[in-house]
């Protein structure tokens, strides 16, 4: 019996209100525990694809399933429950700058509480312990009581990763997590994502602008151009020429 995909996109198309086609007939399956990197030019549709998975962008046609359940058709409380399974890491970190690192990381537990409780950021001792352990996992425990705006960009991104770990999702979507970071810090962030993938068996899908990091950390590479998937293959089987095709316009799609 075939393994049920953790993420499945069926004939997914996204057309924006101004008529721009963000995604065009995307068909994609990602299995539990994979580390998938998505590459392509700026504006190719990478972020749209990623953000469609957890409904930050609603799609125009098709369906998206998370562990076999349609997130496209889910609403209200059930959508909130489904989103618990999906952690998001942004290029801009999305931290509350004037709050402590501990409070920012504890926010990963907000999806587990009713709205009234999240409004007041009422975290339990268990939540705070989870947050501290997550900070230890990414080497940031010594900053637990620092304000987020006192940290470097790389440190803020690692705090964002700790927040996702505190959430304990099954899927991590990382949208250009290293875009504003120097090479050394970028590698540290990717090592953190690798740790979440290997230690906690979290499925990681990351948009990356660095081909070097994509080749080093990805199990599988998906090339996107003009809203379409033009390549999908195992990283170890992907020659350098494929990246040129993805960025320069040649076709390079690999069938299973």
From Swiss-Prot:
Main location: membrane
Cellular component GO terms held in the UniProt record: plasma membrane
Membrane topology according to the record: Peripheral membrane protein
SMART domains for the chain: AAA
Domain ABC transporter intervals: 7-251
Substrates-to-products reaction catalysed: phosphonate(out) + ATP + H2O = phosphonate(in) + ADP + phosphate + H(+)
The enzyme's E.C. designation: 7.3.2.2
InterPro entries recorded: AAA+_ATPase, ABC_transporter-like_ATP-bd, ABC_transporter-like_CS, ABC_transpr_PhnC, MetN_ABC_transporter-like, P-loop_NTPase
UniProtKB keywords: ATP-binding, Cell membrane, Membrane, Nucleotide-binding, Phosphonate transport, Translocase, Transport
Protein's name in the database: Phosphonates import ATP-binding protein PhnC
UniProt source species: Lactobacillus delbrueckii subsp. bulgaricus (strain ATCC BAA-365 / Lb-18)
Gene that this polypeptide is encoded by: phnC
